């Protein structure tokens, strides 16, 4: 193989199809838009959800539910994730964010009981599940709601 024999992989390069450049090109005259009509014009086409004047589906269906502006969303941490800390360490939301276990604090951190805790820790968080609280205290650690 020589330098002048190098070629791109088959199908990796596709020539852009220039439309409206003469009838013999195969895409001249109407440029693949069919005959006349709204969709053939420049800027033509109907808006999203338009059904030709018929009441669109999104207006035929009833409204449902609401968005609670006071909704609290907690960052969730499971017990097995807390094993990343040293024995006897104090775990706070700030420490969890710094260590990368939690991306953002949100409305606070909630500790759930999935997995097994092997370290004695002092955990400070906004909420704890019952099983998580029991597991932390069973290992000799302490729980503090902040």
Curated annotation (Swiss-Prot):
Keyword Acetylation among record annotations: no
PANTHER family according to UniProt: 50S RIBOSOMAL PROTEIN L15, LARGE RIBOSOMAL SUBUNIT PROTEIN UL15M
Region described as Disordered: 1-51
Protein name: Large ribosomal subunit protein uL15
GO biological process, one term: translation
Single GO MF annotation: structural constituent of ribosome
Gene3D superfamilies: 3.100.10.10
Protein family (similarity comment): Belongs to the universal ribosomal protein uL15 family.
GO CC, one annotated term: cytosolic large ribosomal subunit
Oligomeric form and interacting partners: Part of the 50S ribosomal subunit.
One Pfam family linked to the record: Ribosomal_L27A
Composition-biased stretches (Gly residues): 23-35, 42-51
Protein purpose: Binds to the 23S rRNA.
UniProt KW keywords: Ribonucleoprotein, Ribosomal protein, RNA-binding, rRNA-binding
Positions of disulphide bridges: none
Organism listed in the record: Streptococcus gordonii (strain Challis / ATCC 35105 / BCRC 15272 / CH1 / DL1 / V288)
GN (gene name): rplO
């Amino acid at each position: 193989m020589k330098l002048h024999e190098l070629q791109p992989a088959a199908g990796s390069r596709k020539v852009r199809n220039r439309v409206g450049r003469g009838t013999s090109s195969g895409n001249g005259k109407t440029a693949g838009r069919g005959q006349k009509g709204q969709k053939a014009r420049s800027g033509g086409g109907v808006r999203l959800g338009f059904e030709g004047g018929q009441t669109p589906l999104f207006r035929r269906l009833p409204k449902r539910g609401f968005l609670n502006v006071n909704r609290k969303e907690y960052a969730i941490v499971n017990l097995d994730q807390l094993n990343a800390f040293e024995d006897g360490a104090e775990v706070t939301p700030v420490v969890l964010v710094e260590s990368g276990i939690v991306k953002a604090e949100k409305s606070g951190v909630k500790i759930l009981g999935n997995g097994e805790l092997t370290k004695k820790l002092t955990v400070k968080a906004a909420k704890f599940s019952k099983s998580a609280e029991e597991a932390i205290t069973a290992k000799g650690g302490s729980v503090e709601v902040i």
